[in-house]
Curated annotation (Swiss-Prot):
Subcellular localization: Cytoplasm; Nucleus
Organism: Capra hircus
Cysteines joined through disulfide linkages: 56-145
Reactions catalysed, as given in the entry: 2 superoxide + 2 H(+) = H2O2 + O2
Primary role: Destroys radicals which are normally produced within the cells and which are toxic to biological systems.
Transmembrane regions listed in the UniProt entry: none
Protein name (database record): Superoxide dismutase [Cu-Zn]
Primary location group: cytoplasm
Modified-residue entries (N6-succinyllysine), positions: 4, 10, 90, 121, 135
């Protein structure tokens, strides 16, 4: 059973980063940094597939094995892959430090082999008042992505 994972984020533009995942009890600690972003919030999600053959678009929708509506990371009604937003500073750097109780590195909610995505816009956490909000949080296009793999 994996206790650690890593993801290298890359895109067509300047956005890149490295994200680490570590199982700690019944939660997963997500840490790392992303550079090349515009200042402000950016949606941060685990997507269904580890397929990046057509860039980030082939990663499919948010990882949602429970068939729920999109929400924020602290909401009961959320996709497993809904990790909310990362916040970039004026230098375009986002420091990631998330503890999540729903994602896992093993079992039915495992994120291993799936794609981590950082989006162009803020995630409205399902509160945008339209249908797209309940699916994607209106987070816009993908800036960078990478497949989550087992780490030593």
């Amino acid at each position: 059973m994996a206790t650690k994972a890593v993801c290298v984020l890359k895109g067509d533009g300047p956005v890149q980063g490295t994200i680490h995942f570590e199982a700690k009890g019944d939660k997963v600690v997500v840490t790392g940094s992303i550079t090349g972003l515009t200042e402000g919030d950016h949606g941060f999600h685990v997507h269904q597939f580890g397929d990046n053959t057509q860039g980030c678009t082939s990663a499919g929708p948010h990882f949602n094995p429970l068939s729920k509506k999109h929400g924020g990371p602290k909401d009961e009604e959320r996709h497993v892959g809904d990790l909310g937003n990362v916040k970039a500073d004026k230098n375009g750097v986002a420091i990631v430090d998330i503890v999540d109780p729903l994602i896992s590195l093993s079992g039915e909610y495992s994120i291993i082999g799936r794609t981590m995505v950082v989006h162009e816009k803020p995630d409205d956490l399902g509160r945008g008042g339209n249908e797209e909000s309940t699916k994607t949080g209106n987070a816009g296009s993908c800036l960078a992505c990478g497949v989550i793999g087992i780490a030593p």
